[in-house]
């Protein structure tokens, strides 16, 4: 599978997201502007009343993504401030999904994350 096959809109569902972050999000993946075999994109979350709160201080409703698809592993870094990595995504293609479903874990690495921030399971599903 090539990174280009992941270009498009994805629905994100988190299992047990941390306080203040929603259980659902949208992700747009595209070709990276500098590295044609890599991915870039945006993850969009509705932070609602939690936006700007201490619990999610390190996150924005829209965060930039950059990463790679490496031998079936999806590896993305997330940045809410365009400077530091505020989250990491590590996922694998679900067998039999033809590259349309990935499951893995998201990790909060923002300044507001606790030292022992848990890995948060996610499922990405490609939208038509």
Give residue spans per PLM region.
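Central antiparallel beta-sheet cores of small beta-barrel/beta-sandwich binding domains
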Residues: 1-128
